[in-house]
């Protein structure tokens, strides 16, 4: 049975080339209910009613393996494991083609759509155990009642220890571990208490800046605290303040954090959290617990003056 989803988002704004431009997105996916869980679709970006960029993508599990590649770079940390087609087609805004850098700021909406609408096609089971001094969790992905992947991790390691039931069914790369971590964190975070965020951050301007890229000012002076949203409740953590104006294709800041506890209970696990904010997506390297192990996540800050 063919299932079609379509979703429109209007009234979103981005500061590009010194002016405010109204954006709308159209997401469309087609899913066949078959042994191969694959969705073909497109992402279209409209600026003031004019088609700005369209990406044609294929997301899903092919007949042989669950692909670990991406359509475009800015999508990598969101749903790398589920993007099958690395190529894409882009329709620029003719003479104002530079406006396509809006994708890097708003791509979170695209990924959220795929996560909420399509990824439910997979049966996902993940458990979290924080009773010991180091967190232990298990992640298992099933497709059509077949174990495609089982992951078990004890503590925060450079790489997850994993067992693929059939190694040909899952192409596990270090980059797509990010998405798995994100899922696991959603399950675990509701059980976390009494932690504080210590900003120990550095910033790096993206390279390969060329004149053709639009100048976008990223006003990143967030409030004193932002709220972490999870399945059951909200937590508040402190965020750093910084200002950056780049002539770049992507707004990327490499930020390192150390998350520690408010309590003096040394037997409790060191934990982490993913603050979810507003429009600007920033790549962050989080250093977890006493191991200081780098794990890639996406960190969002509030945008505006």
Swiss-Prot record:
Residues 1-19 form the signal peptide. SUPFAM superfamilies: MHC antigen-recognition domain. Residues 20-270 are lumenal. It comes from the Viruses. Keywords: Host endoplasmic reticulum, Host Golgi apparatus, Host membrane, Membrane, Signal, Transmembrane, Transmembrane helix. Residues 289-305 are cytoplasmic. It is a single-pass membrane protein. One of its GO terms (cellular component) is membrane. It is found in: Host endoplasmic reticulum membrane; Host Golgi apparatus membrane. This is Membrane glycoprotein UL142. It comes from Human cytomegalovirus (strain Merlin) (HHV-5). The gene is UL142.
């Amino acid at each position: 049975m063919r299932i079609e989803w379509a979703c429109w988002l209007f009234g979103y704004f981005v500061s590009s080339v010194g002016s405010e431009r109204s954006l709308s997105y159209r997401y469309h996916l087609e899913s066949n209910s078959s042994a191969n869980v694959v969705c073909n679709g497109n992402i279209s970006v409209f600026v003031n009613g004019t088609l700005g960029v369209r990406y044609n993508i294929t997301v899903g599990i092919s007949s042989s393996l669950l692909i670990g590649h991406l359509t475009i770079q800015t999508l990598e940390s969101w749903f790398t494991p589920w993007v099958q087609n690395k190529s894409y087609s882009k329709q620029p805004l003719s003479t104002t083609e530079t406006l396509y850098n809006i994708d890097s700021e708003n791509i979170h909406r695209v990924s959220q759509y795929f996560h909420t609408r399509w990824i439910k096609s997979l049966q996902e089971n993940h458990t979290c155990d924080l009773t010991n001094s180091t967190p232990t969790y298990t992640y298992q992905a099933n497709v059509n009642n077949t174990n495609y992947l089982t992951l078990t991790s004890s503590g925060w390691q450079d790489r997850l220890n994993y067992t693929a039931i059939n190694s040909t069914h899952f192409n596990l790369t270090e980059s797509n571990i990010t998405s798995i971590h994100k899922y696991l964190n959603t399950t675990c975070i509701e059980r976390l208490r009494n932690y504080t965020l210590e900003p120990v951050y550095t910033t790096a301007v993206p390279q390969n800046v060329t004149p053709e890229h639009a100048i976008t000012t990223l006003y990143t002076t967030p409030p004193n605290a932002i709220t972490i949203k999870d399945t059951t409740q909200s937590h508040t953590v402190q965020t750093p303040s910084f200002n950056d104006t780049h002539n770049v294709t992507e707004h990327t800041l490499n930020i390192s954090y150390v998350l520690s506890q408010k309590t003096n209970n040394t037997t409790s696990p060191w934990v982490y959290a993913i603050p979810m904010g507003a429009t600007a997506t920033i790549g962050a390297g989080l250093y977890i617990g006493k191991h200081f192990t780098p794990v890639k996540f996406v960190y969002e800050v509030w945008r505006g003056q």
